[in-house]
From Swiss-Prot:
One of the Pfam families matching this protein, by short name: CRCB
Single annotated GO MF: metal ion binding
Described function: Fluoride-specific ion channel. Important for reducing fluoride concentration in the cell, thus reducing its toxicity.
Annotated TM spans: 4-24, 35-55, 71-91, 103-123
Originating organism: Escherichia coli O81 (strain ED1a)
Membrane topology term: Multi-pass membrane protein
Name by which UniProt lists this protein: Fluoride-specific ion channel FluC
Amino acid sequence: MLQLLLAVFIGGGTGSVARWLLSMRFNPLHQAIPLGTLAANLIGAFIIGMGFAWFSRMTNIDPVWKVLITTGFCGGLTTFSTFSAEVVFLLQEGRFGWALLNVFVNLLGSFAMTALAFWLFSASTTH
């Protein structure tokens, strides 16, 4: 149990730092769409799709790696709370179109990235 807790802790910290670095680098590039948050959510969605595909096929992987990558890293990297706050900020500024676009791009993009990764990595592990 302690190993699993440490895996979540280490993965979560690493994912959070990665999200912060993405936000610092890419959020200033566009005034209405926080590109760093979007990148974090899309990358995290892809990684979790890849992880679930691999873990469903490769049942001998240590559970520590599973929670480190999915619950830990992807949980720290992706962010629904920051995304929600950024949408509310856009709404408060009266930028309703940008807020709606932000919602659609984050949600649909994340679903698409998870599905793509799951499909790609399920196909690659069937050999």
